[in-house]
């Protein structure tokens, strides 16, 4: 089962996914969003009756912007309507620029048992070049915290970044492995039509 939280802290210059920067005053209207997700899930149930769900992936945008209580509510909605296997993998995407130690622990308490961290690079220069909201120190701290809180986690890395050499990309891979990442997802920077990077 895949669900998306299309809210982001800032627009990402290379991203062409359906995502929206929250520009409203006050908090993100999480209850309204979850109500809409519930409606969507209930409309889709006839398509999946009788199937057993092995994994749940809460993608983005940046679902880690939502409160742990909202993630708990989302997982309760899913569990009460779909048949999940015992010990189902429940992954949530997180941005190193939006993490706090207690939030990670609260997401785990809500039932998230795997984090996918959008590190992209451990180089401040590369992160700045692609307009990320976090820096290298925040990326390292998020990976280290994920290693201590979650049973398993993923680190997203990008390569072919502006000004990035082969040695720079290899250094990112080495650092992710040294920090104990059990899973890596490596993506080539793609210039998608309609994004600032493509123009």
What are these regions (language model features)?
Residues 1-8:
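Single conserved hydrophobic/aromatic residue that forms the stacking wall/gate
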């Amino acid at each position: 089962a895949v669900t998306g939280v299309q809210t982001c802290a800032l627009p990402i210059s290379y991203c062409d996914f359906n995502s929206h920067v929250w520009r409203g005053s006050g908090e993100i209207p999480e209850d309204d969003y979850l109500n809409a997700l519930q409606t969507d899930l209930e409309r889709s149930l006839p398509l999946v009756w009788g199937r057993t769900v092995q994994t749940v992936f809460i993608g983005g945008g940046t679902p880690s912007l939502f409160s742990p209580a909202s993630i708990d509510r989302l997982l309760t909605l899913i569990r009460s309507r779909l048949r999940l296997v015992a010990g189902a993998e429940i992954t949530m995407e997180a941005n190193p620029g939006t993490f706090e130690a207690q939030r990670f622990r609260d997401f785990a308490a809500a039932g998230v048992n795997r984090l996918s961290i959008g590190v992209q690079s451990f180089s401040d220069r590369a992160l700045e070049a692609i307009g990320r909201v976090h820096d290298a120190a925040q990326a390292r701290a998020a990976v280290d915290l994920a290693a201590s809180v979650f049973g398993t986690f993923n680190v997203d890395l990008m390569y072919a970044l502006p000004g990035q050499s082969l040695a720079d990309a290899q250094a990112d891979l080495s650092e992710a492995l040294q920090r104990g990442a059990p899973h890596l997802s490596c993506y080539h920077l793609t210039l998608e039509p309609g994004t600032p990077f493509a123009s």
